[in-house]
């Protein structure tokens, strides 16, 4: 819950495309620490949201995530379960960050007075704005008529940010 500023109208796809273009280089000189999930591990947030890591089947090297959020806005309860792999992150990278209608109002008015918020670039194109009962703008990543944009943002983009903060980025 860092209050991350919005990036692009297309979520984080420009970052994904930049990484793909630059390529990934394996540094064989640096030691790598591997973590093994031996049993389900769940982290629960104060509002009922959670992230669960599941162990892979014997001989399998995949990581399965079960992510849920529960916001007191039109976003409401959302949940996705997926195996972490390239296509899942590309799908999730289309998700924009989100905020409530009240936060958007603040950013567009009083927030312009303060140096830490005046240039964050909040628009209805690059952020999902949720009112109490309905979205202010058009949500993306629909499944069965319901937007899962906020939970995909949490599952993919917030997870990448958290993992990047691990010791030595590994």
Residues of each region from the PLM?
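Short acidic-hydrophobic catalytic motif
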Residues: 1-170
